[in-house]
Regions:
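Short loop/turn motifs at secondary-structure junctions and domain boundaries
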Residues: 2-3, 42, 139-142
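Short acidic (Asp/Glu) and glycine-rich catalytic loops that position anionic groups and cofactors
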Residues: 1-3, 28-32, 58-65
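Short secondary-structure junction/hinge motifs that connect adjacent elements
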Residues: 28-56, 69-71
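Short alpha-helical functional segments enriched in proximate histidine and acidic residues
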Residues: 26-33, 106, 130
Length: 159
């Protein structure tokens, strides 16, 4: 276990300290085995990590309580502790967790009730991997420069 004296800072409460300790222990016990093949099967390893994080209850921090999360609203301190702890143990694990929040955030904030019901609980459980579009040719990571658009065609969407 690393030095966790920072958890004594006044903006962390008992729940944050318990979360950091529990995740650090879990990561030490599980991540080496989960990520042993990450260079051979990157996609498969990410799926395995997300499923395991979900099974341990950690991806539920990426969605609100209404979708199976731990808090009524997302708790940024918990999210930061999770990301820092995962990154210290394995960078790919941090990336896989971060995508759960980045992809589900827009659905939490702007998704229809049907979209929220379909995706967010599955994200909380680690059963679905959230994603979002950030890049395309000639736009790089400039979201405003993207030219891809979606238009409704009957019951479908066409990109």
């Amino acid at each position: 276990m690393s030095d966790q004296s920072f958890l004594d800072w006044p903006f962390f409460n008992r729940e944050h300290r318990e979360l950091a300790t529990r995740l650090d222990q879990w990561a030490g016990d599980h991540l080496s085995a989960l990520t042993a093949n990450e260079h051979d099967d990157l996609d498969g390893t990410c799926k395995t990590i997300v499923k395991a994080l979900g099974g341990a209850g950690f991806t539920a921090y990426a969605v609100p309580a209404s979708a199976g999360g731990h808090h009524a609203k997302l708790d940024v301190r918990s999210l930061c502790l999770i990301r820092e702890t995962l990154a210290r143990h394995n960078a790919l694990s941090d990336f896989a967790f971060a995508m759960q929040g980045l992809g589900s955030g827009p659905i939490s904030l702007f998704g229809s009730e049907a979209q929220q019901a379909d995706y967010l609980n599955a994200v909380a459980m680690g059963d679905k991997i959230a994603a979002f579009a950030l890049s395309e040719p000639d736009a790089g990571s400039d979201v405003a420069g993207m030219t891809c658009r979606a238009r409704r065609d009957g019951d479908d969407w066409v990109l």
